[in-house]
Amino acid sequence: MRNAIEIHALTKRYGILTALDEVSFEVGRGELFGLIGPDGAGKTTLFRLLATLVAPDGGTASVDGLDIVADYKRIRERVGYMPGRFSLYPDLSVGENLAFFAALFGVEIAENYDLIAPIYRQIEPFRARRAGKLSGGMKQKLALCCALIHRPAVLLLDEPTTGVDAVSRSEFWDMLSELKGKGISMLVSTPYMDEAVRCDRVALCDGGKILAVDTPQGVVGRF
């Protein structure tokens, strides 16, 4: 199986608004693929479709070879998803959040600790602190650990560094580069071109449409 994600004419409407308009592209296995575009471009809608949280109104898509409609339950076992807003439990500690998500996926933390260890070691000194009391950068690292705890084949990250400082942003992308080296396929949205250039390829989107798919340098050259 060559592609981790395949999207063909995917469409989503909310009433009279077409949030996604026949979107098509592929993410190769082991690829770090960026989705770049302004607010309202349809990025979050696409992530929600791929994470099987909403159903499409047209077109098809597959994640890790599984159809997002017919195989939605199996996809949820194979995908790690970080939504744009912090979605962990603010009143649970760092350690409790991680344990909760491990239990949710039916795994033991020790099973996949090698995957999250480089990230978790940075927040482990705060493991007793409530998640809601962490800094923005620490929250994102915890959310990434929770998204990885079941060792997903595909990682979906919706603007994971929005609202965090420049140093934390750079550290986060360093972590993504390490995960790519471990064979995890990733689709990451970002409003920042300095982040997009760290991707293998990017899709430029606006108004629910894909305007271009190319290397970051290729997209810059065309626009």
What are these regions (language model features)?
Residues 130-134:
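Conserved ABC ATPase signature
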Residues 155-158:
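Catalytic Walker B motif of ABC-type/P-loop ATPase nucleotide-binding domains
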Residues 59-70, 75:
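Conserved ABC transporter NBD signature motif
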Residues 213-214:
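ABC ATPase "signature
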Residues 144:
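Hydrophobic anchor residue at the start of the ABC signature
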